């Protein structure tokens, strides 16, 4: 999505930036997203509120923002909302769940951080497997199939506005430090420098701070 192309997720992000700073807006959306997920998991409103605040204000989000990983935090902030939509579609209302999924997934994809999208697919697959087993035990495979098809459709709708940007990312990825190698040396066994890869990662004793606001 170029500067002159207005899409739904781009318009939403742009509108929210008028209301608050980008960093605060991203953390707010992370809290809202996790709050909705907690509600879809039948948590009491107060518990859902605490869960949302804890997720949004987690140390890892603040660390990533301060390190300049803005698109990563934007992508992470939408992930609970996507899972909420999938769960709501299977357990309550498939149309409502599909709408929630399409909204949050379009916002997530617009962030254009494919590493986080890759992780999100694993989470969705885990939820899907659990729901498939539950549907099998309840004899509701037909309902599961219809809901799954609807969610796939909502994913395609969410993908369409950001497809040009994703295509551009794919084209230019070959010219980055993480793209294809331009040096043919069979003796080289190392990739990126370890310090470069783990510069902003937690040490072994720090991982608990990821869930402490």
Placement of each model-derived feature along the sequence:
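Generic amphipathic alpha-helical segments used as scaffolds and interaction surfaces in large
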Residues: 12, 25, 116, 120, ...
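Generic detection of long, well-ordered alpha-helical segments
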Residues: 15, 27-28, 146, 197-201
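Periplasmic/ER-lumenal interhelical loops and adjacent helix-loop junctions
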Residues: 1-3, 163-213
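Short hydrophobic helices that act as membrane-entry/anchoring signals
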Residues: 14, 135, 209-212
